[in-house]
Amino acid sequence: MRLLDEELFDLLNGELDLERAREIQRAPKDLDRRQRLLAIAQQKLGWSEPIMLPLQENLFVVRTDAGKKVRCRCGHYFDDYRRNWKESALVYERDPQDGELYSSTNAPTKEWMILREFYCPSCATLLDVENVPQGYPFIFNFLPYFDDEPE
């Protein structure tokens, strides 16, 4: 299904009505959709470095002169995409029993579980949340593979 650029833009911004979004999800994808989505994101953000891959709503892998880096929507650079960007983020470890997220009867015990919130050090955008056992290392969500990388 060939989409108009306006529809792709609205889809990226969450402004497309739900029924149309579902229709698009169910339909076969046009072969150049990924490139078109990257072009729209590139235009929207206005960066000179090309976007290689959106990691999530506010994080992207971009190609720089120093290699591929993770970059926040605000422009902040994290480290090389092969390192866990969370190690360079601001981390807030929330007490799950503070009552803000869970009622006292549903909250996990803080001796067992921890809620980690990861924020951009430049713009303070919430980038990710993990609910993990105490002492568990940061989760590396995924490591993208790029064809031009040596093995």
Place the predicted regions along the sequence by residue.
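N-terminal pre-domain and mature-chain start segments
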Residues: 1-115, 119-151
